Amino acid sequence: MTGFATSAAAQDSTQTLQQALKQIPQVVLSAPAAMQVFFLDVQAWRSLEKAGPSADGMRRLSIAQPIRPLESIGFGLEPWSANAKVPFDEVSYFAGFGQAPSNISYWGLKDKKAVGTLVASLKQGDFAAVDGDAPGLIANDGEGKMNMQKANQKDPWRGMMGKASFVLPLDTALIQASSATGMKILAQPAPSVADSEVVAASLAGLKEGVPADRGRIVQAAVISPIMGLAAVDPAKVLLSTNGDADIAKQNLKAAVEANGRGIPPYFSGVLADAQINNLPAVVISLAYADCATAKQAVDGVSAAWKESMAGAKDAKVAGTTVQAGKLCAAVVRVTAPKAENAGNPVLAEVMNRYMRREFTVLQIGAAR
């Protein structure tokens, strides 16, 4: 196990991710899901292939897949851009949370002016102002409506089922939802996901794991302890926004005893797809109460990776701990030996196992 070579540059590779998380209300972190927030840095992903996405580049988008506007990019970025009323390459990031059909998506643009321009373009089409709790809300149909005559697989505002979109400008982003419900909460995201102490600790670790002078975060997911507790009731282990950390610790301890071998229970984490020194990598950063526990997690994740991830056995595994305020992050980076295309074989192995419920690297349990 080796740590990371530290970079003299004080840049921050998590800047765009933090910008996205600042727009999302912290209440999202109480959702009983393993992956609570999804994120794609459009500019980082597009930098992998200047000519346009290949099949490998498209397949790489396994973390960001649930974000609604990305459902329409498989038919090419040009038709997507024409229907979206904004060039794909002018989008800074996409983010989202929740499950279809009630999932919420965020379109991050370069500034407020770009947001105003896009809203004006949408109003020239079939979007119009609608009444709601949040001023500035526009929609292209009634709540829950599907208009098959307007269905268009290449249109991120409609999709193949012609679903309605409700859109709200928020600072330098647009929120896209399938109804006006909850827009009042979304319009005032403070305290945000980025304001969460445990998420901030995970981001501090991620910043170390992806050096800004040599690497970029392509996609990321904010993960909860549910990722490592396949057999445990999610509601019992989540630290709600006004939750009691001591009760959460007790519940986690009980869950650990029921779950078998694994790493110490973490509060929150980030699973990131990155490109570092032109090589695809996966970086995992988990928030802990102290660095002694975080060190156990680094060792445990590294050992579990070598033990269970046969499909990525040639990958280089490195880890470290990062003090983050009162908390400490356990950071493990797994880098592919070479970049054969625009894909990420390490991420593919992680997501394939995750989908089959066989991703045990983050399993919470008694020390290995």
Could you tell me what each predicted segment is?
Residues 11-102, 108-368:
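Soluble, non-membrane globular domain cores that form compact, hydrophobic packing
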Residues 4-10:
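Sec/Tat signal peptide C-region and signal peptidase I cleavage site
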